[in-house]
């Protein structure tokens, strides 16, 4: 089988995660600045057998969409143009940042590493992807 690439899209940065070939386990990749996102995706898709994208769906506790969703829709439109043969799926990302912070806090990392926003973003992407993979 092939791999799935997950993206936790943010205003400044995007966290990435990738699945194994069996599409059963999610692994964190990197967090990149938004200005580098398309080049990063290009590099990943050239070096890995990606067949699907999973992009976080930012909802509030009351199930409303965050304003960031408008920006994400533009991002998805560009991804569809650049990768017309790859599937694009959405996954609810409610509480992923909070869960990522909790997981990091329970780790053996030093405090400065635990507060690293880039680490939180890529762990959030991993949580989004693992949630998606459980449904396959």
Where are these regions (language model features)?
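Phosphate- and other anionic-substrate recognition elements at nucleic-acid/protein interfaces
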Residues: 2-7, 11-12, 17-136
